[in-house]
Amino acid sequence: MAELTISSDEIRSAIANYTSSYSAEASREEVGVVISAADGIAQVSGLPSVMANELLEFPGGVIGVAQNLEADRVGVVVLGNYELLKEGDQVRRTGDVLSIPVGEAFLGRVINPLGQPIDGLGEIASEEDRVLELQAPTVLERQPVEEPLATGIKAIDAMTPIGRGQRQLIIGDRKTGKTAVCVDTILNQKANWETGDKTKQVRCIYVAIGQKGSTIAALRKTLEEQGALEYTTIVAAPASDAAGFKWLAPFAGAALAQHWMYQGNHVLVIYDDLTKQAEAYRAISLLLRRPPGREAYPGDVFYLHSRLLERAAKLSDELGAGSITALPIIETKANDVSAFIPTNVISITDGQVFLESDLFNRGVRPAINVGVSVSRVGGAAQTKGMKKVAGSLRLDLAAFRDLEAFATFASDLDAASKSQLERGQRLVQLLIQSENAPQAVEYQIISLWLAGEGAFDNVPVEDVRRFESELHEYLGSNAAQVYEQIAGGAQLSDESKETLLKATEDFKSAFQTTDGTPVINEPEVEALDAGQVKKDQLTVSRKVSKK
């Protein structure tokens, strides 16, 4: 039988180790109780230390955002299915302010406003979390907007140019091509992305607010087919989502954009559209019993958009010189730009592109109203070559619109007015572009310069677009060095101008119009006098009748 030995030293050591590892601290956790839950809003009691915008956890994995902090209760915006909540459910604080994961892996993905993937392609590896409501860069952290961001749309790049770090509003009625303008801008960044040069590459974020799920799926398919999805992230809050998601979606897009901007990258963010965000915020505010103001919007709806759009900036060189360019979209009703939300956003942004339904219905697409559209950055965001050729374009088009309106009532016009009217009609055709077909800057500059030189004046109006397309194909093989010169940022030299004019004249001689008439009218050959004809050079043939 084994002898049992007891070591007092071992017992003493074991007790000492156990007591030293014991902590007398008690963890404190605040737990609230659901008083009521309806219409996406939950009223919770018993969370005295909760922070504004703090995430709260409900049973079943449902989360919410603390909004109204009152003495005896908290108004919570539920992000999820509020129908799962019932009176008496426990609510726990998370201690985290609303934030989303960010990182390079988000390119090419579709996410919800919480940063969770919804495209069925698996989890996304994030680099860090970034707070949604982050402070915008200060005045001293910014630099002036001077680098152009080409949209590929002639009417915008020439007359209302957009620079990196700018906020340019796209405004118009429904079904006027607002989304198409922004999608073309995304597609136009493909050439820069393929260079691999960080200073040229532009990452794109498309924030879809309150749109149909089928529309978002179609847009993703378009980007994928055009090869633009690899540098684009889609933040989707479709119409079927709760109002809270539509309210937060633009801030999620801005947080992801700021992550890349502070790494020295250039980002383009499209908010489609902020009207629906404002309506969602109005619904939330009314359900939270906040006092309504004009058009029932809450008093801080201006601050909602200003703090979002102020995050677009061109950072100073000390901070990496990154940028966020914002293209917010606003939908008007009956072209009324004086409504509450449109006037708010117009006052916040650095210019607007106004799309008009009348122009759209007449086939002028993009349907940009030149008289109302403006860019407050202006020529600072244009290349030297574009600034040179586009200087008088806006005035020429504005004069054409006035003359066109006058010509409908005037029966007779002088020769100068007729010439101006005909050139204006061709300019309008030249600025029309097909959807998903952005044009490189060098092509735009050559087209606009040739139009200013009268190269399109004798081309039938219905053939202008086909003439331009075939002309660029011809010039691409006969004047390729001119395209390379402009693409490098240089202006058109005198030698290049001569080359273009000569090549254009050569092309005109072979161009076939729709009605078969020549573009270049050859001078008529005068008949010779009888004395100038040498009789020995004449051969007369007669038909001999067969008997």
Swiss-Prot record:
The keyword Translocase applies. Its main location: membrane. Its EC number is 7.1.2.2. GO terms for cellular component: plasma membrane; proton-transporting ATP synthase complex. Produces ATP from ADP in the presence of a proton gradient across the membrane. The alpha chain is a regulatory subunit. F-type ATPases have 2 components, CF(1) - the catalytic core - and CF(0) - the membrane proton channel. CF(1) has five subunits: alpha(3), beta(3), gamma(1), delta(1), epsilon(1). CF(0) has three main subunits: a(1), b(2) and c(9-12). The alpha and beta chains form an alternating ring which encloses part of the gamma chain. CF(1) is attached to CF(0) by a central stalk formed by the gamma and epsilon chains, while a peripheral stalk is formed by the delta and b chains. This is ATP synthase subunit alpha.
